[in-house]
Structures are given as C-alpha cells and as structure tokens.
Amino acid sequence: AIEAANAGKKIVILESQAMAGGNSIRSTGGMNAAKTPEQDKNSFDEAAGVEKTLATAAEKFADNETITALAATVKSQWDAYQANPQGYFDSVELMELDTMIGGKGKNNPELVKALAENSADAIEWLASIGAEVKNVGAFGGASVKRIHRPVNADGKVTAVGAYIVPILEKNLQDRNVQFLFDTTANEIIMKDGKAVGIKATGKDGHKVTINAKSVVIATGGFGANAEMVEKYKPELKGFATTNAEGAQGQGIDMATAAGAATVDMNQIQIHPTVHIEEDGNAHLITEGLRGDGAILVNAEGKRFYDEVSTRDKVSAAIIAQPDKSAWLVVDQAMVDKSAVIAGYIKSGYTVTGATYEELAKAMGVDEATFTSTMNTWNQAVEAKSDTEFGRTSFANPLATAPYYAIKITPAVHHTMGGIVINPKAEVLNEKGEAISGLYAAGEVTGGVHGANRLGGNAVADFVVFGRISGQSAADNAK
C-alpha cells in the first residue's frame, strides 16, 4: 500500500479486525535478507553451516534440478570466499538454496528467487521509512546468520512485528491512506474477467462496496480456522494455534471464487516452541532464542535434537517425546541481550534456578542428568562441535546464572499453501494466466515456502511481495 501510495494512487485498506497487523504484529523473530551491510559487521564463523547445506543438497536433493544448480553456484562462491575471505559470507543463491531445502524442494523457484533477490533492498527500504532491523542473528534452517532484528533504546533485541507494524501504519496515515476497520471483505467484484472492486460487510452488518482499478489480497493464511486446518491436514485436529483471530482463509475463498488457482493447501507448519497456558492461550516463543544459543531438553533432562534445524524437523522431534513437549533453556547472559526474553519472564512463562540443579528441580527433571546435559553442551560450544546432534550454530555457553526454562510444545503456526502468484504478485488462474487487476502477497499466497517455511522468511515474504504487489497494482491503475 505504501508503494502504491508513493505512485500517487488512492488507497483503501479493508481490515476485518479492529486493529492493523494480523499475524504480522505477533511476529517475534525478524526478517531474512542476504548480502546486507549489516551482515558484514559480523565476523564469519559459520563454515560448518555452509558445508552442511552443500552436503544436504548433494545427498538428499540430487534429483532436484533447481537445488542442484543453486548448490553448484554456492559451491563456487564458497570456494572463492575461502580463497579470499572478505566480509561476511552469504549470497542470494545461498538464501534461495536454504529456502528450497527448507521447503523440501516443493517451492516455486521463481518466487524464491524474487524473495532472495529483493531481500537486501527491502531491508534498506524499511530503514528509509523509519524501521531499522540491523541486529543480525542465526535462525533454524539458515546456513549463516541472516535474520535481521530490531533493537530497543537499550540495544536489546525486540519483537519485529510489534516494532514494524506501527511504523508501517504511520507511513500509511502520513500518505492519507484510508483504513476501514472491522470490515470483512467477502467478494471480489469481477467484470469481463477483470477484478474491479470488493464487496464487504461492516461490523454492524452494513454493506460496503469499493470500486477499484486494482485489488490486492493480503488477508493472511487460515491458521486460526480449525475447521479449514483439519480439512487440509486432518492430523492437526486439536492442535493449538499461534494465529490471530483474523487468519480465517477468507482471502483464499474470495480468490478462488474469482477464478484463482491454489497450491500446497495441505502444507501447514507447526511451530516447535509455543508456550500454552493452563487456560489454553498459546504464546509463540521466538526461534531467535535457539539461534542465540538456547537448547531444548526433554522430560529426562536430556537434549534430543539439533535445535536449529528446520521447524518441521524440530517439531517432529518434540512430538516424538512421551509428553509431546520440551523445555527451552536460556541463561542470564541471553536475558541481558533480549527484551523479548525479559518479556517472557515478566509474563510468567519461565521457571528459574540459581544453579543447574535448582533449575532442574523447578522443571521437574533429574538434577544430575540435566547438569550433565548442560556441562556437555557448554563443552560443545567451546569446541564448536556438537557430536551428539550435529548442531552448527553455537553462540555462547549457557553458563551465566540464574538460569531459565520455558515449557513448550508445537502448535499450528503458518499455512504455506494459498493463492498461486507469479513474481509480479499477479494472481494466476488454473491455466497459469494472470487475472487482470488482481494481486496477492504474504501468507495468503502459496509457492514461496513449499512444504516448510524457514523462520525469518515470513516477514521477508510480506515486505518483498507486499512492495511488488503495490507496484504492480499501481502500474495497472495507470
């Protein structure tokens, strides 16, 4: 919408909820981007991650032409970097490769390419409108440190969604973009095969009709629609969700009624680390904790998997535990660097202990086993070698008291399937043809993430394709 407004177009945004933000405002991680100046401010210590990705491509995706070609390009780049290591190693192609491997090769390569190629520029664009995300960290499924996060006035990492969304909203207000809150769109007006407006219903039931030269669907996924989730993936019946109430899938329904094709509707992600309170409320615990050094232990007080693997694999490992849950463990040094963790503590999500033994007692796990687990992990960090589970991202030892743990379990988080689009964010019909005047961006679309989304790619998705959809819609409205 900002891009379309910058092009001089009159914009109306229909929002089904009473406030802007949807799932995005709940995002606690950050935004992936490759080859940024912010990355170059970090020392490179992720060689093992790059080597592991190249090995995975060769061993598990040799029959995937896109992944094989990307791996060959990255291998050439990696060899050149090792011969002359300047700056921080990353590339657009490595981000593509990570995303394709994370998505099990089911992604649309053209969309992945657009995502990665435009990611660094999107970081600069955010900065230009007042949203700086310059703290770079590690996240699951990424070969290198690529996730960009905001920091607060104290220099501590803070939640990306609660930071970015108000800035986006202010920029829209400054551009006189009209918001209609509590207004649910329910039909795309079509005329002669073209999208020419929207029909909607207000909170009190009154009808709203908006005539337009271009329509952009950015309604999010369907993770809060339990019936729809169960329809496409029955095994997720009864799972809690991290999603905002508005994630009902209505945008997908409207688009298909207008002739749009869909893809990957059964690809639904469960996030591995969600804290569920006794009243059933689910709270997303950011993947950034694991990227910054946290570990997972089970009811026996033992580690059981590579914590920074992809979300699908970590979730499966947790579900395989007898109680389908685990403990996420951090130390005071991590708390001191993160306003997000401080928020979890304030909200009462944690148990704590001045020693490993005290924390184990608070968690209800065997003290000797847990203490041994912590000592073994700290030794692995010092050696930068995890012989138990092959983790390649270490940060610092968990050795600064007091210690904290959060009980977590997987919950429905992201729907990778949705409306079929092309790299211009044009909505396509079943024949692969663009529907004139109709565009889509973000979680309502399918194809970007394949069978599994990497943490940090959702924000990249909605910023990159949000900009593209606004530009395309504005061009169409000339």
Enumerate the language-model features and the residues they cover.
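Glycine-rich FAD pyrophosphate-binding loop
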Residues: 5-27
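An anion/pyrophosphate-binding glycine-rich loop and adjacent beta-alpha core
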Residues: 59-71, 252-367
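Conserved redox-cofactor binding core of oxidoreductases
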Residues: 90-206, 226-228, 275-276, 381-400
